[in-house]
């Protein structure tokens, strides 16, 4: 059973700050004084008195969210979906703005869903409590909490009341998920998240703005999880979802699009890009989404090098295949970029029309399990000797650099430790040769290989 709480409210009332406070992660949801910063639903995992609870941070409802027919309408649909999903709805309002007409409208809307409602009056620091209390008590809601998400005022009392509520309602709470079993979880350290789950594969979906990343993740999750819009930069934060498919756990991170540095103009975009790059240190597999109509750009090549440098397995997803002719597909596959990365698989899809997407899970499995494949030390040393025979190490100060043996250091990424003398003098060209040689002989499609060179110390040199 998954117990779920949704944080609902107007824009800029402190929902994301409260989300970060409750989940114990300062940087999980983007929080700022800018209105409408959160655009997609974000899920967090909190534990209150040994009770595991899913927390949903929803986009802020604007004054005219129901009237607009573009992005604001999409945001409102995200909010309604979260309300339906939730066992408890926490309506967050701002004490500084006092009670607004929009707050009353939201309460009326929530009552139609027949959900239990907690009213959270946020930003009470420095205000006259009696005046604030009187104004919001006129709403007639029984469960009311006066808090400061920034300073932590009233948070402990709130969490205890949440736990008491779920304890009293535990017999009536039951969830049944169709098509996919969806589980949401988060911890303070995402490197250890889902450690109690077996075979959790973490996947980041990365690419330039407006290449179809959010559309793809909605298809993979079989639900409208993130907002899709034709304007670049719709996704601002790094959203994640965990699904179970064929008894394997997949944690997907949908990230903000990364433009060239000289085109990043706003502070919010800088934060979003920084968080996207940090995710590369947390995931096992990266789906690099490229607009097949545009072909490979310098920015795509930069992102690919960044992914490989971080040791992630990578699959190139060429989206918008429905718009390509056969000749255009051949030209894309014959690009210079692909010839440099023969170990990386490319796959054509149309996320919009759900074409070619079903095989993506198979490609993810292949890339991930290749990265943790057990390889005997004797085979590694045998491949190393063959590489040296075909192309000897360079000479340094009249002596040839000596490479002795190699073994596996760790997996995911596969790290091979090579021992020898004066290995620090090896050129980058020769190191690249060895990496490519191991890649071809081990046939680890989609997986990165990292070589670590360890020189033996001369006992006669002090």
UniProtKB/Swiss-Prot annotation:
GO annotation, biological process: ribosome biogenesis
Q: Which residues bind GTP 1?
A: 9-16, 57-61, 122-125
Where the record annotates domain KH-like, the positions are 373-457
Q: Which residues are GTP 2-binding?
A: 207-214, 254-258, 319-322
Q: Which UniProt keywords apply?
A: GTP-binding, Nucleotide-binding, Repeat, Ribosome biogenesis
* Xref: Pfam families: KH_dom-like, MMR_HSR1
Show the SUPFAM superfamilies listed in the entry. P-loop containing nucleoside triphosphate hydrolases
**Domain EngA-type G, residue spans:** 3-170, 201-372
What molecular functions are annotated in GO for this chain? GTP binding; ribosome binding
Q: What does this protein do?
A: GTPase that plays an essential role in the late steps of ribosome biogenesis.
Assembly mode: Associates with the 50S ribosomal subunit.
**Protein family membership:** Belongs to the TRAFAC class TrmE-Era-EngA-EngB-Septin-like GTPase superfamily. EngA (Der) GTPase family.
What is the name of the protein in this document? GTPase Der
The organism encoding this protein is Buchnera aphidicola subsp. Baizongia pistaciae (strain Bp)
Lineage, top ranks? Bacteria, Pseudomonadati, Pseudomonadota, Gammaproteobacteria, Enterobacterales
